[in-house]
Amino acid sequence: VTITDIAKASGVSKTTISRYLNGRFDLMSPETRRRIESVIDVSGYQPSTIARSLKNKRSLLLGIVVSDQSSPFSTAVLLGVGDALRNTEYVPVFVNCDDDPAKERYQISFLLSRGVDGLIVNTTSYENPFLVNLEARGVPVVLCDRYIKGHTFDIVTTDHDSTIRQLLAHLKEQGYGLPALFSQRWDNNSVRLQRRQAFAA
């Protein structure tokens, strides 16, 4: 079944079918939309993502890089990204780095070799010239949670400074005088650095 078959069965042009498949319902009447929808349901037609990506010169793949997939935080990121992309054309490609900067570079290079349209990265490194270079080359990169020293990427994160200060204030109100902070190494992790600095302030 092709787009031409759907157009003939619906009594409309291929342009109208293309508009329907691209969600441009504002360019057709409700009756036309229902008729096309019915024909597609009966025929079992599935548009070719590969053909569409070739036409638009996009892969419709989005690389999702997590630093440690065993972490509950990484699980939340993967679920959230999957939910956000569910009603879009994009297909997420997930990779794990095991908190290893060398593996992160390898995995990102792998994703780029597969032609992903962009990257969402929970980076392993506070100092990351590899990602900085990618952004300078025009690769769309959005950071998740951890930022990179000295560079302003688009980022989705938490206000860790404010969170720690609120936590300490709450503990003080509850009568706890000398709280302690236990952490993994923080020298190359922006989130841990922020928490430590807020704790020491």
What annotation goes with each model-predicted range?
Residues 94-101, 185:
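Short beta->alpha junction loops
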Residues 42, 83-88, 106, 112, ...:
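Bacterial carbohydrate/catabolite-sensing allosteric modules
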Residues 115-123, 180-183:
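Periplasmic-binding protein-like
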Residues 16-18, 54-69, 170, 177-185:
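Short beta-strand segments enriched in small/hydrophobic residues
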Residues 1-2, 40-73, 77-79, 88, ...:
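N-terminal helix-turn-helix/winged-helix DNA-binding helices
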Residues 22-26, 68-71, 185-190:
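Short histidine/acidic/glycine/proline-rich micro-motifs that form metal-
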Residues 1-59:
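N-terminal helix-turn-helix DNA-binding module of bacterial transcription factors
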